[in-house]
């Protein structure tokens, strides 16, 4: 194809059309024309290729927990369906922002796990696959079983994978322990040496746009009440031991003003001020080292649980707090 970014070109061309409905119609027509051209070129090139491999491209466009979830999905596909897998990471250079367009996301997978190998799709591969083999819904395992080529844009639930499978594929301790220093190293030692350490993750940031916030009826007061209830329930569960709570959050000022100020004086807690704010995987590693955990919403705390090796762990979450 003559032009590398037809989406951008089409948007520029249709912008001169004043009426939105007609502008959208023309955009769809031009996209259909470009897609047809890609298909024709692909068929010609594919027929001329002798050893071309079929593969699946997985779109990486998430925070760190989402990146890990998609990596594990890719490994599962390779192990169970004998497919080649590549990853499209172009989103991090094009946008890389959260839902509210405030927090910058980084592709940190290889910074955290330096011992894994992943194939990055080229811009040309991404453009072709996105236009010809794009799927954002359906049974992806069935698609992988029956399709030679796929571009997968979806968000796999990390809880759908077996904990032992994740720990087999990724060794977070081997990759991160030697990188701990200063405050992070002190916190790690305190967490692992305390007989009743409890990691508490409080998701903020784009929480109002996060679907999981619906469990709290999108209400900060209900959200705060849950945190207090979970803390005091954990204290009861761990008696006669006295737990120490280690708080992690992407908005610690909110936690200080809305949680710490209202905790009973007998609650022993500390907040975790990451030495490297951009490297969120250190928070995940520290959380995974605690004896017990309290979840709020999102995949971050769930993924930390996947790396936790305590066989007697107590986990409190919005799903189970009323049944414990």
Which residues does each PLM region occupy?
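Short, solvent-exposed loop/turn segments at secondary-structure junctions
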Residues: 62-65, 90-95, 156-160, 203-207, ...
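Donor-binding and catalytic core of enzymes assembling or modifying cell-surface/extracellular glycoconjugates
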Residues: 64, 238-321
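Short beta-strand segments
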Residues: 87-89, 199-202, 244-249
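N-terminal pre-catalytic "stem/leader" segment of glycosyltransferase-like enzymes
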Residues: 38-90
